[in-house]
């Protein structure tokens, strides 16, 4: 039986891993020409909006990947449940 708060802890774990990614992993750096092209394509006001969206997506994706990797490792080698 699953714990009733498992979905909440999953979301919290992803956000925690995203925070750790912000501290430990490099963020993508775009060239000026590509950044201007993306700003125009997505109808943004300036580069700061683009980088805000880019960093949020980047770190949430990395956090989700880290969470699932750590969960797999935990369940595979360290979990005591049968």
From Swiss-Prot:
It is found in: Cell membrane. Its main location: membrane. Pfam families: DUF1158. It is a multi-pass membrane protein. PROSITE patterns: PROKAR_LIPOPROTEIN (PS51257). Keywords: Cell membrane, Membrane, Transmembrane, Transmembrane helix. The keyword Transmembrane helix applies. This is Uncharacterized protein YbdJ. GO terms for cellular component: plasma membrane. The keyword Cell membrane applies. The chain crosses the membrane at residues 8-28, 50-70. It comes from the Bacteria.
